[in-house]
Amino acid sequence: MSIFFSPSSPTLFFSTTNANPRVSPSSSPSSAFTPPLSSSRLRPILRGFPCLAFSAPANAAHGTAETVHGNKWPSPSSSSSAATQPSAGSDHGHSRTFIDARSEQDLLSGIQRELEAGTLPKHIAQAMEELYQNYKNAVLQSAAPHAEDIVLSNMRVAFDRMFLDVKEPFEFSPYHEAILEPFNYYMFGQNYIRPLVNFRESYVGNVSVFGVMEEQLKQGDKVVLISNHQTEADPAVIALMLETTNPHISENIIYVAGDRVITDPLCKPFSMGRNLLCVYSKKHMNDVPELAEMKKRSNTRSLKGRMALLLRGGSKIIWIAPSGGRDRPDPITNQWFPAPFDATSLDNMRRLVDHAGLVGHIYPLAILCHDIMPPPLQVEKEIGEKSWISFHGTGISVAPEINFQEVTASCGSPEEAKAAYSQALYDSVCEQYKVLHSAVHGGKGLEASTPSVSLSQPLQFLD
């Protein structure tokens, strides 16, 4: 996912193609949205301590969805690569064109059938076909047992959710809570990305620091992750890397996210399974010049209003990428590296944390996963970019929190302090990224560890 965006006016996301859009539940009492559907369909699960262990996908053969019973998920160790299936009886009246598919031919002919019926726009139909082929090729690269079955299982659910959104566009609230029932969008996203991750060549840096975070969250503190941003799969990769060691963090991160991942029909079902604070992407702020000022004001309201409310609540963990978008490779060397941070955006976030009235902690986080779902080489204005997908190793790493007062003690002005703190966080992210790059792309594995970045491997591989 890219990082991200801020709409404070709900009407900014209304679709003009459907008179009865589905609406996300919002924790804000001021939200102007009123769900037109049964509240049981969209009711989010309130997540809190004790830590929730989450789960394996549903039994695909029976077409059932995993749901929460007594606030406990099935053991993470039972999870597989097949995506969560829609529960029986959900989405009354929704076509079963894709969910009933039993072969690749059924899926692809279903796209053509809905296109001819006028229920699936041509550009979306073409994008779905392209996505299928790319996803299939990537999963087959893994040489996993039953890879073709995994592709069919995951893609029929993905197409089913995408087609449902085409017919009944879901509208995100400025603050969106992950939808876990009656369809578990969180596990759907996890298990869709899972077979794309080469766990044998994936690494976590300083896993003990994530344990420190969990203890701080249990005490009611707030945690902010200042991160680079690589792909739309970032949230799933973070959660997969931590799902066996730090499940509470995996499930409860709130991502500051851009408007593109909540408007593209092929992205929206995955976004519905994440906790999101929605803003307008900095890199697309001027795509339509006459809307630029409105977008800036909306972002300010979202970040200073809703973000402040979230932080004052305590026990929240928030992820934000101060670069304002995804990393891109150097046009000359073709090497990937974290995009520079915007010092003002980062300073605004720090001030919100400081003024929230509870103990706050700011950590630098590095992500390396661009091979799985690389963005276009150039920033594009149009919604609906091509989906390049591959099977590859990934990595995340976190460093100990960086204290503003310690970093800026010798600074002579607020502007100098702002720049120094931003640079300190960025330098830490870059240092960690280099270690991850050496481990994954340099082939050094665990030997890439340094005195400041201790690498381990996800327990999915070790088990």
Curated annotation (Swiss-Prot):
Alphabetized SUPFAM superfamilies for the sequence: Glycerol-3-phosphate (1)-acyltransferase (SSF69593)
Pathway in which the depicted protein is active: Phospholipid metabolism; CDP-diacylglycerol biosynthesis; CDP-diacylglycerol from sn-glycerol 3-phosphate: step 1/3
Keywords on record: Acyltransferase, Chloroplast, Lipid biosynthesis, Lipid metabolism, Phospholipid biosynthesis, Phospholipid metabolism, Plastid, Transferase, Transit peptide
Reaction catalysed by this enzyme: sn-glycerol 3-phosphate + an acyl-CoA = a 1-acyl-sn-glycero-3-phosphate + CoA
Intervals of motif HXXXXD motif: 229-234
Annotated GO biological process: CDP-diacylglycerol biosynthetic process; phosphatidylglycerol biosynthetic process
GO molecular function, one term: glycerol-3-phosphate O-acyltransferase activity
Domain notes: The HXXXXD motif is essential for acyltransferase activity and may constitute the binding site for the phosphate moiety of the glycerol-3-phosphate.
Known function: Esterifies acyl-group from acyl-ACP to the sn-1 position of glycerol-3-phosphate. The enzyme from chilling-resistant plants discriminates against non-fluid palmitic acid and selects oleic acid whereas the enzyme from sensitive plants accepts both fatty acids.
Protein name: Glycerol-3-phosphate acyltransferase, chloroplastic
Organism classification: Eukaryota, Viridiplantae, Streptophyta, Embryophyta, Tracheophyta
